[in-house]
Amino acid sequence: MGLRIKICGLRDPQQAIAIADLGATAIGFIAVRQSPRYVSPAQVAEIAQALQKTHPTVNRVGVFANATAEELEAYVAAGITSLQLHGDETLADSQRWRDRFPALELIKALRIRSTADLALAESFTDCVDTLLLDAYHPQMLGGTGATLDWQALQAFQPSRPWLLAGGLTPENITTALSQLHPAGIDLSSGVERSPGDKDLEKVTALFSSLARNSLLK
């Protein structure tokens, strides 16, 4: 399987289709009301329907933080195919959503401050399908533009696939992937003009950089 490429924080159906055209394997939707990239279930349904017609294999990821069952159900009904838990969800929370939504991919995101956080990440491998490592910020859950210490992550080899996030851009992606070998990458602020408004030139530059360095295989 090739590198998974998730572009997160979309709000516009045409941008979603254009980014899928460029080669994204997943589109992420922020279901956290405090986020400037927030989209309602109705907005997600509109984008999901458009993607289902043009790119049915592209994964549609709902990004949640300490969500209720009702919130998750609303976005699942809107057409998401993966649940990304990006808050302070515990192992018990993750197992509960695993049991409730067995057909959906379950991703647990962890905001990494130290190697102790990497050990915590590995503890989730029994109840989730995929891990995601993001940079820690005291006030923001994601989309901060801050990068991780890639060198410190080199020993991270969990038993589940993992995605690298945190301040990735078309300019630094090849450096990151020369040091690390995740199953996929997740970009948001590094390819946008403003929160929720993606810059298609930057997304194109991302794929060009990956292709030029033979990283799309």
Curated annotation (Swiss-Prot):
GO terms for biological process: L-tryptophan biosynthetic process. GO terms for molecular function: phosphoribosylanthranilate isomerase activity. Its EC number is 5.3.1.24. The keyword Amino-acid biosynthesis applies. InterPro entries: Aldolase_TIM, PRAI_dom, RibuloseP-bd_barrel, TrpF_fam. It comes from the Bacteria. It catalyses: N-(5-phospho-beta-D-ribosyl)anthranilate = 1-(2-carboxyphenylamino)-1-deoxy-D-ribulose 5-phosphate. The keyword Isomerase applies. Pathway: Amino-acid biosynthesis; L-tryptophan biosynthesis; L-tryptophan from chorismate: step 3/5. Keywords: Amino-acid biosynthesis, Aromatic amino acid biosynthesis, Isomerase, Tryptophan biosynthesis. Belongs to the TrpF family. PANTHER family: N-(5'-PHOSPHORIBOSYL)ANTHRANILATE ISOMERASE. HAMAP family: PRAI. NCBIfam families: PRK01222.1-4 (NF002298). This is N-(5'-phosphoribosyl)anthranilate isomerase.
